């Protein structure tokens, strides 16, 4: 550890908290500043701050937690996690071109080798991480602090201090911002990152922000009343694909399901201004079996009309750092649509890779500050060069996966390619063949490399199918010629 300077982390969500745990191994002066305290439920919080879509934990996130060296933390997190072995796709049976009223479920396994994803409660994960930080003496956490300005030259940041709404009937803001010096600033303050905005004042930073033509609404399937148990098999991500609509259900530790309705904003706005009967018809048409079987009409009506309908935002930027002074990680650097379940995992992987590179460049081993700055600048440059490409790759994959989830999972082309690739992965492992989903979720291959390998596999399959067609033509042509020769 070094005593000089201070590592300041803006944002105390899962990514910022994990960064603080990593930093605590190298530095004895780490401070985390967070706007809200999720151990409480502040009154009047913005709907954006109250979001509770379940996290999906996969190999990348698990490896980052393991690398933190906090085995008890990982065990505590995994105790509350629910394994999901695949997707359970719901709908009505199709006979030819007609759709019957009979409900059906189709299981799509995630991985031929039995790997699973894990459904995590957002608040439980945050609490587990913050309890670990509370037990780490060289990390200090400051809640109700909002970053308002940064001077990257003098390495100082200023925070607006807000009163704790749980202890005050009329929360107010302090008139004098709190000044905090830093040696190294890590921004993990989400999609609307102030750290990123401040970095843009000091360096050219390419920035792209895109809203999807889809909004989301959170709903809940409660446990059964008599036995307080799951209403659906718990070890699956349940999906009702509906063309331009989609309904997903994630299992929760309290035997409920956290559900997300995705739909075009115009459609949800129209439903919100319509009578409940229209809402019930909409669910019966697009998500059969949900209402009233899983959610009663009264509960669905209450939840839908009272829950906020929130936008989906995707962000790309480059670079992710400023000299030796600052870096942004997680959603601050690469907010993505939630359709690959990689937002949390990519953010945690950011932390692992960032500190691996800082370690490789011996940033924390340099005694002189000038040498340390040069080493950290080199490490951060390498970090940006690597993570920008990977962040852009998973951002694009996440957007593309939405099209697959809301309808493509039932397409013959999707099923055929999945069947062939899984067969090659299972029976000819020496080829190194894997499905795109398996590479993304059950490996730590760079996202950009995953895309390249998947495209190569696509070309190989296309070539194989073309050769197959050509072979059929040649065989049948030869047989036809032989037959005509015999007739003569």
Curated annotation (Swiss-Prot):
Q: Between which residues do disulfide bridges form? A: none
Q: Which InterPro entries match?
A: FAD-bd, FAD/NAD-bd_sf, Kynurenine_monooxygenase
One GO BP annotation of this record: L-tryptophan catabolic process
Q: To which pathway does this protein belong?
A: Cofactor biosynthesis; NAD(+) biosynthesis; quinolinate from L-kynurenine: step 1/3
Q: This protein's superkingdom?
A: Eukaryota
Q: Provide this UniProt record's keywords sorted from A to Z.
A: FAD, Flavoprotein, Membrane, Mitochondrion, Mitochondrion outer membrane, Monooxygenase, NADP, Oxidoreductase, Pyridine nucleotide biosynthesis
Q: Which GO terms describe its molecular function?
A: FAD binding; kynurenine 3-monooxygenase activity
EC number(s) in its UniProt entry? 1.14.13.9
Q: Which SUPFAM superfamilies match?
A: FAD/NAD(P)-binding domain
Q: Name one GO cellular component term.
A: mitochondrial outer membrane
Instruction: Mention any Pfam family matching this sequence.
Output: FAD_binding_3
Q: Where in the cell is it found?
A: Mitochondrion outer membrane
Chief localisation class: mitochondrion
Q: Which reaction does it catalyse?
A: L-kynurenine + NADPH + O2 + H(+) = 3-hydroxy-L-kynurenine + NADP(+) + H2O
Tell me the cofactors it needs.
FAD
* Protein family: Belongs to the aromatic-ring hydroxylase family. KMO subfamily.
Q: What does this protein do?
A: Catalyzes the hydroxylation of L-kynurenine (L-Kyn) to form 3-hydroxy-L-kynurenine (L-3OHKyn). Required for synthesis of quinolinic acid.
Protein name (record): Kynurenine 3-monooxygenase 2
Query: Coding gene?
Result: bna4-2
């Amino acid at each position: 550890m070094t005593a000089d300077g201070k590592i300041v982390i803006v944002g105390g969500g899962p990514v910022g908290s994990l960064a603080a745990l990593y930093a605590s191994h190298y530095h004895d002066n780490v401070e985390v500043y967070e706007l809200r305290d999720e151990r409480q439920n502040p009154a009047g919080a913005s709907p954006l701050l109250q979001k509770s879509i379940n996290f999906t934990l996969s190999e990348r996130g698990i490896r980052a937690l393991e690398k933190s060296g906090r085995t008890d933390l990982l065990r505590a997190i995994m105790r509350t996690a629910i394994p999901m072995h695949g997707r359970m796709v719901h709908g009505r049976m199709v006979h030819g071109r007609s759709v019957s009223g009979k409900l059906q479920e189709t299981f799509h396994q995630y991985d031929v080798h039995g790997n699973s994803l894990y459904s995590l409660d957002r608040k439980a994960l945050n609490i587990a991480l913050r309890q670990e930080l509370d037990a780490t003496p060289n990390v200090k956490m400051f809640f109700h602090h909002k970053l308002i300005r940064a001077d990257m030259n003098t390495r100082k940041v200023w925070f607006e201090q807000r009163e704790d709404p749980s202890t005050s009937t009329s929360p107010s803001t302090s008139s004098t911002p709190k000044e905090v010096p830093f040696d190294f600033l890590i921004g993990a303050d989400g999609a609307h990152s102030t750290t990123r905005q401040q970095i843009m004042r000091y360096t050219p930073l390419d920035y792209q922000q895109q809203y999807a033509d889809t909004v989301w609404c959170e709903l809940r399937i409660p446990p059964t009343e008599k036995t307080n148990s799951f209403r659906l098999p718990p070890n699956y991500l349940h999906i009702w694909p509906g063309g331009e609509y989609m309904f997903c259900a994630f299992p929760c530790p309290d035997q409920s399901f956290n559900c997300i309705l995705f739909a075009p904003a115009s459609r949800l706005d129209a439903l919100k201004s319509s009578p409940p009967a229209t809402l019930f018809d909409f669910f019966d048409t697009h998500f059969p079996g949900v209402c009233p079987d899983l959610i009663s009409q009264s509960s669905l009506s209450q939840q839908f009309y009272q829950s906020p309908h929130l936008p989906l935002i995707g962000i790309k930027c480059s670079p992710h750092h400023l000299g030796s002074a600052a870096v942004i990680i997680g959603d601050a650097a690469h907010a993505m649509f939630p359709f690959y379940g990689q937002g949390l995992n990519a953010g945690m992987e950011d932390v692992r890779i960032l500190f691996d590179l800082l370690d490789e460049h011996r940033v924390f081993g340099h005694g002189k500050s000038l040498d340390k700055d040069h080493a950290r600048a080199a490490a951060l440059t390498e970090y940006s060069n690597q993570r920008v490409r990977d962040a852009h790759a998973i951002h694009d994959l996440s957007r593309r996966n939405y099209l697959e989830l809301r309808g493509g999972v039932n397409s013959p082309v999707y099923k055929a390619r999945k069947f062939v690739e899984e067969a090659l992965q299972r029976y000819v492992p020496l080829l190194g063949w894997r499905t795109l989903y398996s590479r993304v979720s059950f490996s730590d291959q760079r996202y950009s490399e995953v895309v390249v390998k998947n495209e190569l596999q696509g070309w190989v399959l296309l070539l194989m199918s073309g050769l197959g067609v050509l072979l059929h033509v040649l065989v049948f042509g030869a047989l036809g010629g032989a037959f005509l020769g015999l007739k003569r």
